[in-house]
């Protein structure tokens, strides 16, 4: 839906802009205002009370969503020998080193996550300028540089997502699909909030969750009560 389309305006009119919705109510509103032409992706945008310019306030991490993401995740793995075999058996979409790196250097980035064994990182560094800006560069902090590639592939395929605050202290994450129940979306939201609370920098002062908005692909944003940090599936 274009923000100027009749369908978008009709959907936006269903949202009470002056209300702060509970996570469950927000999920219900997002489902009701999502496109009926396809199974839209549901996302959340969170503005954190941090200063990303300070290294100790650069919030980033991963979380396994209890209900998955609802989308097919394409995973590539930089590995050789037994590790490559393990990655293939775990369901990785593309596994390799030299040929894979050459393919990426040629502009191919048709995948959602990249994993590498530690011994391959020097080679992977050759495509850092391609992967980095897209958030695809393997990193030990997100569990994507590992010797247990099978576990990493299984986790990502099963609903593990990565998140990172941007320069404006905003963070975006997928919560699932509009076909999910509102309870499933609220549970996934709760898992993300729990992990963000665990990662809260000790040097961060004031309100940690400044603004939270839930929305579907091209749908209107639904303001979420940013003071709710538990009991995510309770009714309003």
UniProtKB/Swiss-Prot annotation:
Offer one example of a GO biological process linked to this entry.
translation
- PROSITE patterns from the entry? RIBOSOMAL_L1
**A Pfam family matched in the record:** Ribosomal_L1
Q: Which UniProt keywords apply?
A: Repressor, Ribonucleoprotein, Ribosomal protein, RNA-binding, rRNA-binding, Translation regulation, tRNA-binding
A GO molecular function assigned to this protein is: structural constituent of ribosome
Q: CDD domains per the record? A: Ribosomal_L1 (cd00403)
What's a GO cellular component annotated to this UniProt protein?
Answer: large ribosomal subunit
Entry's family note = Belongs to the universal ribosomal protein uL1 family.
Q: How does it assemble?
A: Part of the 50S ribosomal subunit.
Task: Describe the function of this protein.
Answer: Binds directly to 23S rRNA. The L1 stalk is quite mobile in the ribosome, and is involved in E site tRNA release.
> What is the protein name stated in its UniProt record?
Large ribosomal subunit protein uL1
């Amino acid at each position: 839906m274009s923000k100027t389309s009749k369908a978008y305006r009709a959907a936006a009119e269903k949202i009470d802009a002056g209300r702060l919705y509970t996570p469950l109510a927000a999920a219900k509103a997002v489902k009701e205002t999502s496109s009926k032409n396809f199974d839209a992706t549901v996302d959340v945008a969170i503005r954190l009370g941090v200063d990303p310019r300070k290294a100790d306030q650069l919030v980033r991490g991963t979380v396994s969503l209890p209900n998955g993401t609802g989308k097919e995740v394409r995973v590539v793995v930089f590995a050789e020998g037994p590790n490559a075999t393990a990655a293939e058996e775990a369901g990785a979409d593309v596994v390799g080193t030299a040929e894979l790196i050459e393919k990426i250097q040629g502009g191919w980035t048709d995948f959602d996550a990249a994993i590498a064994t530690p011994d391959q990182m020097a080679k992977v560094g050759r495509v850092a300028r391609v992967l980095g800006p897209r958030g695809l560069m393997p990193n030990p902090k997100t569990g994507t540089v590992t010797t247990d590639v099978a576990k990493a592939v299984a986790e990502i395929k099963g609903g593990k997502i990565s998140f990172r605050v941007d320069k404006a202290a905003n963070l975006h994450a997928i919560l699932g699909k509009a076909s999910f129940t509102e309870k499933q979306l609220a549970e996934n939201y709760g898992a993300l909030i729990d992990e963000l609370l665990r990662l809260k920098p000790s040097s961060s002062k004031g309100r940690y969750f400044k603004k939270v908005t839930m929305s579907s692909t091209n749908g209107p944003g639904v303001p979420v009560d940013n003071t709710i940090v538990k009991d995510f599936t309770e009714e309003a």
